[in-house]
Amino acid sequence: MLITAIAVIIVGPLVKLESPGPLFFSQKRVGKNGRIFKIYKIRSMYQDAEERKKELMAQNEMDGLMFKMKDDPRITKVGKFIRKTSIDELPQFWNVLKGDMSLIGPRPERPLFVEKFKEEIPRYMIKHQVKPGITGWAQVNGYRGDTSIRMRIDCDLYYIENWSLGLDFKILFSTIFKGFVNKNAY
């Protein structure tokens, strides 16, 4: 929590200077046993991002429900930096303290994606038998952001089926030593 507090003290004013509005962003996610909870992040987009998304749909680089574009104009300059370095994810330590999440586990998805993926990906719902995590086996293996959901699920299932304290330490140390830099973040 100390790291989160320091990051908020440093990054917070920069976020607010570039884009008025709340410092934090929350979104509904699906957790253990399908329970819905609010995940917290430092806001990386302009306040009107959802409205602007409608104008940009023709430039969507993803199929289906997901929306991604390389130089998304909805993301602030500070937002690009905090996404690349995963600083935007630090408020999720609050989710860990609340009991919604664990440090390590499969990343939680939004409810609309869960509905889609449970129909398309065999064994997808198994990931909801454990608490979601801030980092996980998929993330330390490079499957973050704009990577295949199927590859992330394969990693999540591997983690669940092979869980051990040793594997958790391996993931934790890999996260720390590889750094929090997300090459797949836009």
Regions found by a protein language model. Name each.
Residues P13, P22, K32-R35, K80, ...:
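Gly/Ser/Thr-rich helix-start
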Residues M1-E50, L165, K170-Y186:
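A hydrophobic, helix-centered structural microdomain
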Residues P13, S26, R74-K77, Q92, ...:
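Residue-level recognition of specific faces of alpha-helices
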Residues K70, L112, E119-Y186:
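C-terminal terminal-structure detector
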